[in-house]
Amino acid sequence: MSSDIRDVEERNSRSSSSSSSSNSAAQSIGQHPYRGFDSEAAERVHELARTLTSQSLLYTANSNNSSSSNHNAHNADSRSVFSTDMEGVNPVFTNPDTPGYNPKLDPNSDQFSSTAWVQNMANICTSDPDFYKPYSLGCVWKNLSASGDSADVSYQSTFANIVPKLLTKGLRLLKPSKEEDTFQILKPMDGCLNPGELLVVLGRPGSGCTTLLKSISSNSHGFKIAKDSIVSYNGLSSSDIRKHYRGEVVYNAESDIHLPHLTVYQTLFTVARMKTPQNRIKGVDREAYANHVTEVAMATYGLSHTRDTKVGNDLVRGVSGGERKRVSIAEVAICGARFQCWDNATRGLDSATALEFIRALKTQADIGKTAATVAIYQCSQDAYDLFDKVCVLDDGYQLYFGPAKDAKKYFQDMGYYCPPRQTTADFLTSITSPTERIISKEFIEKGTRVPQTPKDMAEYWLQSESYKNLIKDIDSTLEKNTDEARNIIRDAHHAKQAKRAPPSSPYVVNYGMQVKYLLIRNFWRMKQSASVTLWQVIGNSVMAFILGSMFYKVMKKNDTSTFYFRGAAMFFAILFNAFSCLLEIFSLYETRPITEKHRTYSLYHPSADAFASVLSEMPPKLITAVCFNIIFYFLVDFRRNGGVFFFYFLINVIATFTLSHLFRCVGSLTKTLQEAMVPASMLLLAISMYTGFAIPKTKILGWSIWIWYINPLAYLFESLMINEFHDRRFPCAQYIPAGPAYQNITGTQRVCSAVGAYPGNDYVLGDDFLKESYDYEHKHKWRGFGIGMAYVVFFFFVYLILCEYNEGAKQKGEMVVFLRSKIKQLKKEGKLQEKHRPGDIENNAGSSPDSATTEKKILDDSSEGSDSSSDNAGLGLSKSEAIFHWRDLCYDVPIKGGQRRILNNVDGWVKPGTLTALMGASGAGKTTLLDCLAERVTMGVITGNIFVDGRLRDESFPRSIGYCQQQDLHLKTATVRESLRFSAYLRQPSSVSIEEKNRYVEEVIKILEMQQYSDAVVGVAGEGLNVEQRKRLTIGVELAARPKLLVFLDEPTSGLDSQTAWDTCQLMRKLATHGQAILCTIHQPSAILMQQFDRLLFLQKGGQTVYFGDLGEGCKTMIDYFESKGAHKCPPDANPAEWMLEVVGAAPGSHATQDYNEVWRNSDEYKAVQEELDWMEKNLPGRSKEPTAEEHKPFAASLYYQFKMVTIRLFQQYWRSPDYLWSKFILTIFNQVFIGFTFFKADRSLQGLQNQMLSIFMYTVIFNPILQQYLPSFVQQRDLYEARERPSRTFSWLAFFLSQIIVEIPWNILAGTIAYCIYYYAVGFYANASAAGQLHERGALFWLFSIAFYVYIGSMGLLMISFNEVAETAAHMGTLLFTMALSFCGVMATPKVMPRFWIFMYRVSPLTYMIDALLALGVANVDVKCSNYEMVKFTPPSGTTCGDYMASYIKLAGTGYLSDPSATDICSFCAVSTTNAFLATFSSHYYRRWRNYGIFICYIAFDYIAATFLYWLSRVPKKNGKISEKPKK
């Protein structure tokens, strides 16, 4: 991870001619044995400054323009003029041919020195203080305390209790907050940090470190700071900082959130642009300045080689995790904040790289007079020595604040003992841990009382001289905070601001520049992910061809028979254009965390980002619109007129932007994606139904007509229809009456059958059709355009406002979650407090253990295990005598052009009862070795031999080991005990009884000390187990499997605080003491942690062994080995791990004096290892037994038992996931209520029948929302299975997949039943069935179809996600297939009018059979009752009754009826007499109902079978995979 930093530092080291300096930064950095950013001697720095100020072109440019330039930061002056003889930036920095060039200032030079660069910039600024206005910022806080809302110990939400739980929370919100409902996160504390100082904050998770950093960085969102607290920044208040100077005080959270598709350079360059000051170096323009600062930041933090590499994330491949962390650090460094708060910024970095980061901060502080506060969990001694001050916290109490060099003595004087080789930081943190701190023997012998609780230690602090001195410093600093100090900061900030930037704004560049730079960034993103836009255009073009060609045949007639289909095609067009932007909500939530972070850095307004995103999305939207609409318009054969087409295109573009801005508003108004999808889905349904096609405006029920009036698409659809039909005369396609008996009739004796026809006319005017059918008038054509534009503008500004002012979800403190039944039991037993104090905000760390816990001492190996003998009695952990050993292990992976060796002839063994550490530099192959030994690599070639008691590994091996991954992966809804039992049930042999497995689980809980939270739910960060508890559970899950051979642990202490790391090592030590064999990778542990291990296997770069052997007491055996091979002496107080890394050249700035792999292979120790391996291979096979047939099985449990247990667990998870289930049911209820009451009790008129048909069509649109909710749930299950449970052989893929099928079905049956009960009766289908005398059969079959449809949604979702990695991709594919199935189901275009080519799509669409059956079940076998406007009116021949006149026609047509057959003046004729005739026009028939049901069930079965096959094909490892093992003879 830090190799690139090391390369830079090595070059700097070689170029450095002096190692001492009177400069404070140089003095601090020069104290360490291996140095990173080497300092220059004071004389060299001053000489460099003189050279730059006398010879540089900057100075010349300044001199030449002195007459015309002035120092007002906001005048048009020469500093913005870009000199034509500069290459990007002044040649002093970048052009080697320029006189005075210094390579130490050139970030592209191998000799670049960040210290020299910072010093040079400081010299430039101080050379002209009136222009550059240098300033600094410190912070003092007095009586600072913070509080948050108290949280009950929560109970697990379930499907049954979530509603009363939410109601209870709602009632609490209505009540005024009481004092007992809050708790103090921070007790009153004080501090003073002056410019140029570094402060380290130490404390365990939950002690208040994060809250302190947020409080002093004016970032108190989520908690409250007491009114009497004083926080002052040179006289500025927290409110001043938030409103006007937010960018001067920055809080950096530990998470690394970036736009994954941007390169490292683009990410940092955007930040540099936003922070380029107006009063920058004279003669350098903005772009050159930003570019140079970006290159300096990349060179400083070892990122230059990643310049054009994507930053990436968990899903997008990019830079490594450590490099991503450095990008985050560089981002803050470019911001140039004068006061910086770093919250666990070194997490994910090894100690060497973390040290380089602290040194960079020290350089900035010493030279640039910045102030920085760093909360750090594991801090080496070298890093600690760089800090000026330290603050120690415990349980919200301040235990110490003062000089870092005095802290150790302070606590020793208090009565605590610091063991040898323990770092000062670890010692200070251990004071807060009852199980780790050691009371000095001298105090014990004298009987002196030593403060032990946080409150006692805080009181001791308040009585100390150090506290009195601190108060004096604070008071003195507050007195200096005058108006003059505030004016200096105000003037400096104003000088940095660009023209037209409001003086009160915290931003450096103005709003227009922000939008400009963000536009460029967005276009970079689009270029990096151009394939997404390309596929969107291609996909929409294909859909245009498909949908357009569907109407191609019927539209060619251009007569009245096309009326319905023209409306349907127009409806399709506007919906497709409008809803093409629905999935923009996903991208909003992808970028929101970045925007919120940049807002706190004061880079840009969130609304500027929103503005830029809208502008940058215009080109792809317009391209997509052009491709779709040109193809669709001309394929459908809409009106061929240039003006008409462009109006059509204009309206559809407006529809696109209207709905785009509306969905963006929804996304900005909500705080999570889940919150946004529900209202978005509801809006989609409402807008679709009330556009005016599914149910015309004149037919909308009175209670819901307001929805039409506020629906923007209603007006746009009206304009489109007017545009298509106005001033057109459509020839009549069918007359009434017609036939052989009516050849000679003329005039008013016949009429066209289309709506809007007049007797005697052989055509229908388009305007008449629109007026009669939709109540549309031509004068409203441009009204729709105007209203649409108004909506676009309105939603756009609402979107900007919401983005600017909508804050993210507040962070919550941590709480433990139990099952509700268990909470009642615990409260009854008195084991649970009524109130539980949440832990540290933001980091979601666990609250501190009870400070009254019995004091324990650190024990050496001979007395390991702090449990009493009674505690250890009866422990039944699996013990094994088998020895695991390997020899000449090599691992090669294919790369471009050949093979790359990762492991090179590694030997070793792990014996029962021993704890072996696997160490090495970053990239040495530690985790790879662990994976090879555990059979977890998925590609490459393994050579060498891996034995168990002298026998090569066999099929029983994977079941005989436990593997604890670095990530703590668990099912969040299970309790601790349930997780352990699940592992025991499925991984222990089936011959072991359930009772015995349960007893063994209890033993595991006991030895891991998890009794207090054994019934707690695993949960998620902040609401469940904390970091340490999760790590214990990870180990427990593997122990519950009763591995008879050994346990592998990968980086069990990575990312943990020192106390939790110590507890984890103590736990491993305890397991080894009880006979467990353990092999553990660990990254540069502290000296105290190193003493817990028995043996060490150390690898260097290239996977080569440097040492394998005993560590000895105090690591003496290992130290003696290296010293005997020529290494320099290990200082008595040094960390042996860091000393060893330095010796072998694995630490930054260090160089090995010899090849220690060669030294090892030529050593006596190596020969002893080989002899031991020879003995093992010769003698161990005879004492071991051959694995039984049972042990050779891939899984301990049968497939049936696996399926049973996994299904039970999954049912349990669904029950405990109310968000997913209630979202499904709420969407179902809303959709069906909305549809049902929109078409409430539809009558049997022609319009009523069409409404009932379209209601069935709309009934299916719930497919997409339900599908999109299901996919993430499956992905979570699959990730857990594939990452942990499949490699550990817990259960097979078939049991996993079948359980996914089975468990989803009952909930879909329930959802389908709910939908049926609401929809079927609300629309009025039951009335039709009752009138036909078929109430029970039709109702039952309709119900079966309803539940089958919801099961079909689940089957399609499973099919889509079975082979897709990402839920979004599966959702896109599912939506596309559903759209095609719905388009060809026969509703919008009947099979009679479809081109012959598409008939096969009609037949393969599963919705064809469902909608055919539902329509028949809903309306078949009853009479039609036309409304008055649907009756065709004409006059019969004189002297003839209507009945006689129409008899021949009715007989020929087979349908139709007269309202009054005896009438002789006006005949009122309805063209359809029965609903069966209506069904026939859509090729629907009642007799096919059961056949259609059977076919639809076959589709569901096919989906499940295909999904199972595709999952096996794409995701199940095959035995003939990419991994090959070649044992050596």
UniProtKB/Swiss-Prot annotation:
Stored SUPFAM superfamilies: P-loop containing nucleoside triphosphate hydrolases (SSF52540)
The segments annotated as topological domain Cytoplasmic are 1-531, 589-617, 664-699, 805-1219, 1334-1340, 1390-1396, 1514-1529
Q: Where is the composition biased (Basic and acidic residues)?
A: 1-13, 829-840
Boundaries of every ABC transporter domain copy: 171-420, 884-1127
Residue stretches of biased makeup (Low complexity):
14-24
Q: Carries keyword ATP-binding?
A: yes
InterPro entries recorded: AAA+_ATPase (IPR003593), ABC2_TM (IPR013525), ABC_trans_N (IPR029481), ABC_transporter-like_ATP-bd (IPR003439), ABC_transporter-like_CS (IPR017871), ABCG_dom (IPR043926), ABCG_PDR_1 (IPR034001), ABCG_PDR_2 (IPR034003)
> What GO molecular function annotation could you give as one example from this UniProt entry?
ATP binding
Q: Which GO terms describe its biological process?
A: response to xenobiotic stimulus; xenobiotic detoxification by transmembrane export across the plasma membrane
Q: Which GO terms describe its cellular component?
A: cell periphery; membrane
Would you identify the family this protein belongs to, as annotated? Belongs to the ABC transporter superfamily. ABCG family. PDR (TC 3.A.1.205) subfamily.
Quote the NCBIfam families the UniProt record gives.
3a01205
Protein name in UniProt:
ATP-dependent permease PDR15
